[in-house]
Amino acid sequence: MAPLIPRKRHTLRKSETARIHSMLEEEIGESAALFRSDRVEVVSTSAPWSIYLVDRRPLLMAGEDWVFPTLRGIVERPFPERRLVVDMGAVRFMVNGADVMRPGVVEISDDIRVDRPLQVVDERHHKPLAVGIALADAPVIREQETGKCARTIHHVGDDLWNLEI
């Protein structure tokens, strides 16, 4: 991925903030209240997604039809939804940006849906390692024995993780 370069930013209107919040609510339910704020800004960057600053911190990211917390958002305001737990052997691969492989997955939330974002956490400390896009629904992933189950789009140590605004 090319370096993440912030281009410009501006504060969202209340109607836009409400729309972003409702999209976040579709993804993580009632936990979206953790990310409610009077001041939400959007940052234009070189990334293929939008970055939203909540209280001047890059806590949300958005694709074409979804809004989901960044890793920094998950660390600062943890929530239980959309969680894929990987064993400790997968951690070193995840922090380098690898996709999630089924043999390393030990626990799968029931609310994981295909082409929707999810959080990847380690099994021992439950610390977030990555944000990914599910390649299948939760029941299908449970039945799988091999192969990829999520594509990583943001991981610890990448440009978005290190972004300072």
PLM region spans:
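Beta-strand/loop-dominated core regions that host nucleotide or nucleotide-derived cofactor-binding catalytic loops
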Residues: 2-49, 53-58, 62-106, 111-114, ...
